[in-house]
């Protein structure tokens, strides 16, 4: 009878299953972490170490998390866990942005616009707060499911009364430092939001508008001066403007020309016209009209000229402006100070009054016949008809261009002057200080510096006021007659903030001026709320200062690349305005998630990859591995097929660990008592290779090159382990005596390599790393969790065989294997053992 030798072999045995079953296993591990209070244990373990602070940019508390949220939170978690392994105390306090219009709209949708809940401001605020909190709970569950470890029970929320109070205090500091000003500067206005928008809330899309060329007739009294400028007697003449916003013509107050440009007097079927010399051919082609040149003059010589509004009985002043170019149009710029920044600035310079054709909601005032009550964006064709009837219209045609849209409603905006509160970029040197500060910040990728610098250089004053209910109040006390802020306002900020801390943001509505100031009859309370970008932008003051002290600057801000114009910028501006310094030492950005065709994910395209579905079907570790293995600095392609490929990559890593753990089933404290100098040389080699891998990964982690980290670890599992070492030691592991030196040497090496590898994968494959850690007593003896494991000291192993010698040995091995394969293919041998 043939003997069964199976029982004489040291066959692998492990509790680590081949099939991961992550969707079921991961929730069990989450429960385990919760039961041991893992986050707090990590804090206690690292309390005396140097801190590394990654400050969480707050997601908006509305709707389910999407793949972009997952990318952001997973990257942050990888950073935090990596820094913890490197010996830092790296706390993570997540946060949420909770005020603003989207929440208001959802509450209105739930209760109805005409409901008592919506009409009663106090009830409305309570409903908004309740809604935001419910959204936070939903998002929090999904973030935790991703394996993101943080102080979830003490997260910061911009709706917390303490946060709202600190937001008011931060505004107080900014006002005290001289950065606030009131004005009627033109700002982007959204009809759907019924409010002004900040630059960060504006998107640009292609739009077809009506472009018009309009003649502004020179008043008779100015013809003599005009004739002198052109050295030609002129009895009648018009300056021609070009604009893509016909609806702004009723608000025209001036026409701007370039002082350094040349202008030509031409004759045409429309009469004598003046336009920039460089644009005559362009205008002639656009109008289908031959223009006969009569005379030329320099812009600076054309002065003290007054024009007639094309159809309204008022003057339009001709002014010189350096903003005028000859890129397109006529070189004569229609100037409506209520509807353009350049227009506003040039009219302010020449003391020209701003004309308000629109009311505070963007509708034409009653005195504008034919337009009264109309929204500006629907007035273009009517204005064109009026201009045509008046004989001032020269040309009208469609014009394709990039136009500002509301980022929430995807509807076109108007640029309109409304009374607002601004943080001035020039007053008290805020812009200059910000541009200087970004030079000292580490930007990753490096192009981030040029991007934010160019955005700062071109940005207008920051409009921080909103006409909403659900937001932190701007608690200013304003003189009824002069509009000036109360002289004691700087002191009042703290008193008002204390009330908000106790009662919530409703405290400002409840506040009676009698209780705040003596001269209360002369003052009123401001009713505006703060831009939500101010809320999130002041978190360094409201959160970090409280948690870690006023001198701390965050080591890292990590968000999507769109935040150069959003959170990075608002945080920078408030940081400079409050403390005179940037709130971060380094800024790291990631790209957007797209499909295989480079398109953003959207339900309408059917290309959405749901993080919840990935967790339920494949497991969060697969999602985490995809994030880590993708170069996140660029656009990140996510499809079901790519995730399947990532799952295959995961299986190779897992099976490598499973083989190692299977052969360590009887490895214990006694087995570990082996002198490293006595190890078999190949065992020394694999430990040395793992130590080298550890060093390489550490350097890659320092530069956040996680895709290279994954590549290195995967290649090590496939090549050094799977392709060389594990294959070589199989016979030694299976057939030598269980307590033999040869087997103990291999087991010692396997344990050392596994101990190194498990730490390297733990920031990425958090659930799998914990599962492996819990599968062996020697790991569990080190710590309750892989995330509590002490820093491993890696000592170089002395070997009689050099790295170069090993290269020769492995080259010979490969050559022999190739010849064996050839012999097998040629049927010379049946197998390698022959």
Where are these regions (language model features)?
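Residue patterns forming the tRNA-binding/recognition surfaces of aminoacyl-tRNA synthetases
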Residues: 2-15, 19-22, 28, 32-36, ...
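Amphipathic alpha-helical
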Residues: 30, 175-207, 282-297, 302, ...
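N-terminal catalytic cores of NTP/NDP-binding nucleotidyl/phosphoryl-transfer enzymes
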Residues: 44-106, 167, 241-249, 318-346, ...
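Secondary-structure capping and boundary motifs in well-ordered enzyme cores
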Residues: 46, 50-56, 67-71, 75, ...
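Short, solvent-exposed turn/loop segments enriched in Gly/Ser/Thr/Pro and often Arg
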Residues: 46-47, 57-58, 91-104, 155-162, ...
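Secondary-structure transition/capping motifs at alpha-helix termini
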Residues: 81-89, 110-121, 141, 145-150, ...
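Acidic, turn-prone loop/beta-hairpin segments
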Residues: 97, 187, 191, 197-205, ...
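Alpha-helical recognition segments enriched in aromatics with Gly/Pro capping
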Residues: 218, 350-362, 468-470, 478-480, ...
């Amino acid at each position: 009878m043939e003997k069964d030798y199976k029982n004489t072999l040291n066959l692998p045995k492990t509790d680590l299953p081949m099939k991961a079953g992550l969707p079921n296993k991961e929730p069990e591990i989450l429960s385990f972490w919760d039961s041991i209070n893992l986050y707090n244990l990590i804090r206690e373990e690292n309390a005396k170490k140097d801190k590394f602070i990654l400050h969480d940019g707050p997601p908006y508390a509305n709707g389910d998390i999407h793949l972009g949220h997952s990318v952001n939170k997973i990257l942050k978690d990888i950073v935090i866990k990596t820094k913890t392994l490197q010996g830092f105390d790296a706390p993570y306090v997540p946060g949420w942005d909770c005020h603003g219009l989207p929440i208001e709209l959802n509450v209105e949708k739930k209760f109805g616009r005409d409901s008592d809940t919506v009409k009663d401001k106090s009830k409305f605020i309570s409903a908004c707060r309740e809604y935001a909190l419910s959204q936070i709970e939903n998002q929090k569950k999904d973030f935790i499911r991703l394996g993101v470890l943080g102080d979830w029970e003490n997260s910061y929320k911009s709706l917390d009364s303490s946060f709202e109070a600190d937001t008011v205090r931060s505004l107080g500091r900014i006002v005290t430092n001289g950065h606030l000003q009131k004005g009627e500067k033109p700002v982007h206005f959204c009809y759907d939001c019924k409010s002004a928008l900040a630059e960060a809330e504006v998107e640009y899309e292609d739009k077809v508008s009506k472009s018009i060329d309009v003649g502004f007739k020179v008043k008779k009294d100015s013809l003599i001066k005009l004739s002198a400028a052109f050295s030609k007697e002129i009895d009648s003449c018009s300056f021609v403007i070009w604009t893509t916003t016909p609806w702004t013509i009723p608000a025209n107050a001036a026409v701007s020309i370039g002082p350094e440009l040349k202008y030509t007097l031409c004759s045409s079927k429309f009469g004598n016209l003046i336009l920039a010399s460089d644009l005559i051919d362009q205008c002639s082609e656009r109008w289908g009209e031959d223009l006969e040149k009569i005379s030329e003059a320099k812009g600076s010589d054309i002065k003290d000229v007054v024009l007639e509004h094309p159809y309204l009985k008022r003057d339009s002043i001709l002014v010189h402006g350096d903003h005028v170019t000859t890129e397109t149009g006529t070189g004569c710029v229609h100037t409506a100070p209520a509807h353009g920044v350049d227009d506003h600035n040039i009219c302010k310079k020449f003391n020209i009054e701003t004309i308000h054709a629109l009311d505070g909601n963007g509708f034409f005032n009653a005195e504008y016949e034919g337009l009264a009550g109309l929204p500006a964006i629907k007035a273009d064709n009517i204005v064109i008809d009026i201009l045509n009837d008046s004989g001032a219209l020269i040309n009208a045609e469609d014009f394709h261009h990039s136009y500002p849209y509301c980022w929430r409603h995807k509807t076109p905006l108007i640029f309109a002057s409304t009374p607002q509160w601004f943080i001035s970029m020039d007053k008290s040197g805020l812009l200059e200080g910000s541009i200087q500060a970004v030079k000292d910040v580490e930007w990753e990728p490096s192009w981030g510096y040029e991007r934010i610098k160019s955005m700062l250089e071109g940005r207008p004053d920051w409009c921080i006021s909103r006409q909403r209910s659900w937001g932190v109040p701007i608690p200013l006390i304003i003189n009824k007659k002069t509009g000036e802020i109360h002289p004691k306002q700087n002191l009042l900020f703290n008193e008002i903030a204390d009330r908000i801390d106790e009662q919530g943001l409703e405290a400002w509505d409840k506040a009676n001026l009698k209780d705040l100031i003596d001269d209360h009859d002369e003052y009123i309370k401001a009713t505006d709320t703060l831009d939500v970008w101010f809320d999130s932008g002041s978190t360094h003051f409201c959160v970090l200062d409280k948690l870690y002290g006023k001198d701390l600057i965050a080591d890292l801000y990590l968000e999507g690349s769109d935040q150069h114009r959003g959170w990075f910028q608002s945080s920078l501006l408030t940081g400079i305005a409050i403390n005179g310094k940037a709130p971060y030492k380094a800024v790291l950005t990631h790209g957007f998630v797209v499909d295989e065709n480079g398109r953003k994910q959207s339900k309408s395209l059917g290309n959405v990859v749901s993080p919840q579905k990935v967790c339920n079907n494949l497991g969060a570790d697969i999602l985490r591995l995809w994030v880590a293995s993708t170069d996140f600095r660029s656009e990140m392609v996510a499809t079901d097929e790519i995730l399947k490929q990532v799952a295959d990559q995961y299986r190779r890593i897992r099976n490598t660990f499973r083989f190692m753990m299977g052969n360590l089933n009887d490895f214990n404290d006694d087995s570990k008592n082996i002198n490293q100098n006595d190890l078999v040389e190949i065992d020394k080699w694999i430990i040395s290779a793992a130590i080298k891998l550890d060093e390489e990964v550490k350097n890659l982690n320092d530069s956040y090159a996680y895709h290279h980290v994954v590549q290195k670890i995967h290649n090590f599992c496939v090549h050094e382990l799977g392709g060389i070492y594990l294959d070589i030691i199989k016979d030694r592991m299976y057939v030598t005596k269980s307590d033999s030196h040869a087997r103990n040497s291999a087991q010692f090496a396997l344990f050392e390599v596994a101990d190194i590898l498990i730490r390297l994968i733990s920031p990425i494959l958090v659930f799998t790393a914990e599962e492996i850690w819990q599968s062996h007593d020697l790991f569990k003896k080190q710590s309750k969790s892989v995330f509590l494991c002490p820093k491993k000291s890696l000592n170089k192993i002395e070997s009689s065989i050099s790295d170069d010698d090993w290269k020769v040995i492995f080259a010979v091995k490969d050559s022999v294997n190739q010849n064996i394969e050839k012999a097998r293919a040629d049927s010379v041998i049946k197998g390698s053992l022959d």
